[in-house]
Curated annotation (Swiss-Prot):
Listed GO MF terms: ATP-dependent activity, acting on DNA; DNA-binding transcription repressor activity; DNA-directed DNA polymerase activity; identical protein binding; nucleic acid binding; sequence-specific DNA binding; serine-type peptidase activity; single-stranded DNA binding
SUPFAM superfamilies listed in its UniProt record: LexA/Signal peptidase
UniProt feature coiled coil, ranges: none
Originating organism: Escherichia coli (strain K12)
Keyword DNA damage attached: yes
Cited Gene3D superfamilies: Umud Fragment, subunit A (2.10.109.10)
Residues annotated as the enzyme's active site: S60 (for autocatalytic cleavage activity), K97 (for autocatalytic cleavage activity)
Taxonomic lineage of the native organism: Bacteria, Pseudomonadati, Pseudomonadota, Gammaproteobacteria, Enterobacterales
Family note: Belongs to the peptidase S24 family.
Protein name: Protein UmuD
GO cellular component: cytosol; DNA polymerase V complex; protein-DNA complex
Keyword Ligase listed: no
One GO BP annotation of this record: negative regulation of DNA-templated transcription
Function according to Swiss-Prot or TrEMBL: Involved in UV protection and mutation. Poorly processive, error-prone DNA polymerase involved in translesion repair. Essential for induced (or SOS) mutagenesis. Able to replicate DNA across DNA lesions (thymine photodimers and abasic sites, called translesion synthesis) in the presence of activated RecA; efficiency is maximal in the presence of the beta sliding-clamp and clamp-loading complex of DNA polymerase III plus single-stranded binding protein (SSB). RecA and to a lesser extent the beta clamp-complex may target Pol V to replication complexes stalled at DNA template lesions.
Annotated gene: umuD
UniProt-listed Enzyme Commission number(s): 3.4.21.-
Length: 139
């Protein structure tokens, strides 16, 4: 698994943010096209020194919106809770899964073709962070 830390930024780059929502159906002819500026670092990264990026591999999380090749933004400053998507290692093997803490501790794939990973008292589970955003390439 390749972990990528964000580089120190020399300059903040902002991008246009249009105030209207984009209709997935028929667009409104009365749309207002006022724009603002948005800093993607400010939007996507809450804890810069504890945030890293990792590329997803495989299809075990496809029903959770994570596809092969997606870039995951992971915050290691957040304490993982029941239901969070996490980067974890079970006995040294890395995976991205949904964390279940009750009634038993399990790492749940979000694809019915895969089985949950039950964590027993003999297993070592290390959680390396919570996935907070997924960056998808559309082409």
């Amino acid at each position: 698994m390749l972990f990528i830390k964000p580089a120190d930024l020399r300059e903040i780059v902002t991008f246009p943010l249009f105030s209207d929502l984009v209709q997935c159906g028929f667009p409104s002819p009365a749309a207002d096209y006022v724009e603002q500026r948005i800093d993607l670092n400010q939007l996507l990264i809450q804890h810069p020194s504890a945030t890293y990026f990792v590329k997803a591999s495989g299809d075990s999380m496809i029903d959770g919106g994570i596809s092969d090749g997606d870039l995951l933004i992971v915050d290691s400053a957040i304490t993982a809770s029941h239901g969070d998507i996490v980067i974890a290692a079970v006995d040294g093997e890395f995976t991205v899964k949904k964390l279940q803490l009750r009634p038993t501790v399990q790492l749940i794939p979000m694809n019915s073709a895969y089985s949950p990973i039950t964590i027993s008292s003999e297993d070592t589970l290390d959680v390396f962070g919570v996935v907070i955003h997924v960056v998808k390439a559309m082409r």
